[in-house]
Amino acid sequence: MDVIPAIDLLAGRCVRLYQGDYDRSQVFSENPVDVAKQWVDEGATRLHIVDLDGAKAGKVVNLGAIEAIAQAISIPIEIGGGLRDRSSVEQVFNLGVQWAILGTVAVEQPQLVQELCQQYPGQIIIGIDARNGLVATRGWLETSEVLATQLAIQMQEMGAAAIIYTDIHRDGTLAGPNLDALRELAAAISIPVIASGGVSSVTDLLSLLALEPQGVTGVIVGRALYTGDISLKEALQAIGPGRIQDIPPNLDFSSFA
């Protein structure tokens, strides 16, 4: 399973929010490039970047920081936040980003998503951010009437490469992932699901590993890495491609669920 460190950008700095609340941000570094290099040095094979300013503004804002990170590291990057038109998506791909994460437009302009999936096959990921099972949009400031599972099915049909599922009530809380919601989502589609939000311990990571056969292929870890609750190295050893040992086939996963 992929363990993907998150870098959230706000005014050019690396921060973490609590439940998506911009007024409850905590600055972890003034230099996101140094943070990106640190995760690479610790074994990351992929990086998740969110332009928080962009998510609110509806356009990419932290271009300089994104470009600097892309130039400084060699592992692939996925970027989300403010990608709501074709030019913004083209803009980040021109910076050397591997995947573009679309959220709001998936709800508001599904036809555009389909066109972008055709133009960039395998490079469009849909970020589904849910509050009580309903999709939130525009930097989590609005909640739609669209069910997360319904949107995931529609986006799979449009050609999306993967779904990143974030439970907003868990994000930044270290309260553990929403396993039931992830299980339901993964069962509804055949493309990979990447879990995000709430991971606080190796136990949480192992509980997600139990969902890997159902299609949960990765996990994004944010606050827990920055607070030291989890080290990236131990996360990779626990559930990553280089994990210490394979899990016995007769292990009862029900205790994790």
From Swiss-Prot:
Protein's cellular compartments: Cytoplasm
CDD domains, per database record: HisA
Gene3D superfamilies reported for this sequence: Aldolase class I (3.20.20.70)
SUPFAM superfamilies (UniProt xref): Ribulose-phoshate binding barrel
Recorded superkingdom: Bacteria
GO CC, alphabetical: cytoplasm
Spans through the membrane: none
Record's catalysed reaction(s): 1-(5-phospho-beta-D-ribosyl)-5-[(5-phospho-beta-D-ribosylamino)methylideneamino]imidazole-4-carboxamide = 5-[(5-phospho-1-deoxy-D-ribulos-1-ylimino)methylamino]-1-(5-phospho-beta-D-ribosyl)imidazole-4-carboxamide
GO biological process, one term: L-tryptophan biosynthetic process
Pathway: Amino-acid biosynthesis; L-histidine biosynthesis; L-histidine from 5-phospho-alpha-D-ribose 1-diphosphate: step 4/9
Keyword Cell membrane appears in the UniProt entry: no
Active site residues according to the UniProt entry: 8, 129
EC code(s) of this entry: 5.3.1.16
Major subcellular site: cytoplasm
PANTHER family the record matches: 1-(5-PHOSPHORIBOSYL)-5-[(5-PHOSPHORIBOSYLAMINO)METHYLIDENEAMINO] IMIDAZOLE-4-CARBOXAMIDE ISOMERASE
Family of the protein in this entry: Belongs to the HisA/HisF family.
Protein name per the record: 1-(5-phosphoribosyl)-5-[(5-phosphoribosylamino)methylideneamino] imidazole-4-carboxamide isomerase
Species this protein is from: Nostoc sp. (strain PCC 7120 / SAG 25.82 / UTEX 2576)
